Amino acid sequence: MSIKENSYFAGGVKSLGFNQHGQDVSVGVMLPGEYTFGTQAPERMTVVKGALVVKRVGEADWTTYSSGESFDVEGNSSFELQVKDATAYLCEYL
């Protein structure tokens, strides 16, 4: 078992990845900014602390998810995020 450190967007997003009971998971923090992420596998993102404003491919509107709320993203897709305050998240690869 190991912990994988990741840094994206010039350090604006940092995560720690690990495997738990055969499922890949990461936890991390996003600094204020706008980001676009691509997915390979389906994902479930849960906001741990803060808020994420999300727009998934095919959606016209932005949706805000706050602490304790989750959203799913399809595999082989992408989603845009607006982060107004530093926000902690959990990402589960489904």
Swiss-Prot record:
Transmembrane segments: none annotated. It catalyses: a purine D-ribonucleoside + phosphate = a purine nucleobase + alpha-D-ribose 1-phosphate; adenosine + phosphate = alpha-D-ribose 1-phosphate + adenine; cytidine + phosphate = cytosine + alpha-D-ribose 1-phosphate; guanosine + phosphate = alpha-D-ribose 1-phosphate + guanine. GO terms for molecular function: guanosine phosphorylase activity; purine-nucleoside phosphorylase activity; thymidine phosphorylase activity; uridine phosphorylase activity. Its EC number is 2.4.2.1, 2.4.2.2. The keyword Transferase applies. Keywords: Glycosyltransferase, Transferase. One of its GO terms (cellular component) is cytosol. SUPFAM superfamilies: RmlC-like cupins (SSF51182). The keyword NADP does not apply. It is an enzyme of class 2 (transferase). Catalyzes the phosphorolysis of diverse nucleosides, yielding D-ribose 1-phosphate and the respective free bases. Can use uridine, adenosine, guanosine, cytidine, thymidine, inosine and xanthosine as substrates. Also catalyzes the reverse reactions. Belongs to the nucleoside phosphorylase PpnP family. This is Pyrimidine/purine nucleoside phosphorylase.
